[in-house]
């Protein structure tokens, strides 16, 4: 059996992070990059997100969230970037599952912000539309094999650090827009992508767990945003409360 000291330094660091991750557990994490699909049409005012923000984000500086108390949530749609994308080849039952999870994620986030869910536009109503642009289940047996046999993924270490995702793990990407339900004015929009982490899913039957955990991450972050905007009026995400150590762990962990 190889000693930890016999591995190259980058691999040693990842092995140590992996051992920590196995002990404390970890869910989905943010990917390093994401492609814009055109669903939101105008991306000219988007900026790169920082901290716990989405990868790309737009916040209307003139918007006052406190004037809104209700929300309309459109049906979440799926839009693959190419005909050969996992979304295009996905079974109908899985497509319905993703759309349901997406809508439920938005619903839970809005309820955390104490918004009333309605079906008609109004002066105090915001409208939310969202699209799932990527969703791919994990190949769980291969992903978990990398935990018990580090040599399986040693060759992928440098690639994994560079992209933020190891092979065989699940992934989820999407776009969201919040607008005034009457005028259509854009108040907030974001494009983001999250991926699974090694050790977050130990059940070989639960191939969609990485995606489910991605939705949970979005639910928690958007819920935090909506609760804050009801108090401050701004759609800006509250300050990232993670320690520098946790941020480094999230960035480097497989």
Question: What does each model-found stretch correspond to?
Answer:
Residues 2-13:
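Bacterial N-terminal signal peptides that target proteins for export
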Residues 17-18:
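Sec-dependent N-terminal signal peptides
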Residues 22-25:
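C-terminal motif of bacterial Sec signal peptides marking the signal peptidase cleavage site
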Residues 27-59, 163-254:
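C-terminal/domain-edge helix-coil "capping" segments
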Residues 59, 86-98, 114-117, 162-163, ...:
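Second-shell loop/turn segments in exported
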Residues 64-131:
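N-terminal segment of the mature soluble domain
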Residues 80-85, 139-141, 196-200:
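Short acidic/His/Gly/Ser-rich catalytic and metal-binding motifs that mark active-site loops
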Residues 113-182, 202, 253-254:
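Surface-exposed short loop/turn segments
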